[in-house]
C-alpha cells in the first residue's frame, strides 16, 4: 500500500474548559480536509497523580510553591503552617496561569492512604467532600491533615480527562487515537500502563461507548 506520513498531538478533556479539547479535534478535521492527516492521542483514563505534600508535584505550577520545591519535610511543615502561604496558594487557585492542571477542583483530590489509624475513615473520600462535611476550607483541611501526619498522607488527584460524557465524546471522535500511556515517565507519580484493559472494562463493557470489536 501507499506510504503515509501521519502527525499526532495529544489532548485531554478538561471539564473547566471543555471547548479547548473539542477545538483541537476540529482543527484535525480541518487539516484533513486540506489533505493533511492529523490525529489526536487521547487517553481513556483520568490523568491521575499520587502525591504527598512532601513532594506536591501537581501544585508546582502555582507561584506559591516557587522557592520551596526542594525544601526538606521540616521546612515544608513550617511553610504549610503559615497563613500567608495558604493565602498565596488560594490566590493562585483563583487566578491560575495557563497550563495549570489543578485549579481548585477539590472534589477531584482523593485521600488515598492515611498514616494514622484514626484518620482511616477518610480514605477514598475527596478533600472537597470531607471539608464540606466539616464546614472548613478544603485547602486548610488538606494541609492540616498532612501536617498532622508529618506530610505522610497519600493523596490521589484526578485532574484531567474526568467526566464520562465529555471524555467519551473525544474518544469516539474520528480523529482520536486511544493511547497516551505514560507508563515510562513520572513513575513516582503515575502509571497508565493498564489503559488497554481500562478501555475494554469501562468504555466497552460498562458504558458501551465502543463495541468489543472497536475496543
Give the positions of each predicted feature.
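C-terminal amphipathic alpha-helical interaction region
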Residues: 210-214
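Active-site neighborhoods of metal-dependent hydrolases
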Residues: 1-208
Amino acid at each position: 500500500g501507499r506510504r503515509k506520513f501521519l502527525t499526532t498531538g495529544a489532548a485531554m478533556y478538561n471539564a473547566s474548559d471543555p471547548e479547548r479539547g473539542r477545538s483541537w479535534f476540529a482543527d484535525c478535521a480541518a487539516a484533513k480536509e486540506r489533505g493533511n492527516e492529523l490525529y489526536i492521542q487521547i487517553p481513556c483514563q483520568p490523568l491521575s497523580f499520587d502525591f504527598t505534600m512532601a513532594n506536591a508535584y501537581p501544585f508546582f505550577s502555582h507561584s506559591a510553591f516557587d522557592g520551596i520545591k526542594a525544601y526538606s519535610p521540616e521546612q515544608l511543615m513550617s511553610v504549610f503552617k503559615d497563613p500567608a502561604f495558604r493565602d498565596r496558594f488560594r490566590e493562585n487557585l483563583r487566578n491560575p496561569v495557563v497550563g495549570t492542571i489543578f485549579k481548585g477542583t477539590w472534589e477531584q483530590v482523593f485521600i488515598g492512604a492515611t498514616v494514622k489509624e484514626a484518620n482511616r475513615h477518610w480514605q477514598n473520600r475527596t478533600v472537597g467532600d470531607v471539608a464540606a462535611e466539616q464546614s472548613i476550607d478544603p485547602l486548610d483541611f488538606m494541609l492540616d491533615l498532612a501536617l498532622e501526619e508529618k506530610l505522610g498522607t497519600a493523596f490521589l488527584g484526578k485532574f484531567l480527562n474526568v467526566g464520562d460524557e465529555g471524555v467519551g465524546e473525544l474518544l469516539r471522535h474520528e480523529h482520536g487515537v486511544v493511547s497516551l500511556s505514560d507508563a515510562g515517565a513520572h513513575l513516582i507519580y503515575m502509571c497508565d500502563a493498564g489503559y488497554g484493559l481500562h478501555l475494554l472494562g469501562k468504555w466497552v463493557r460498562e458504558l458501551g461507548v465502543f463495541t468489543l470489536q472497536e475496543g
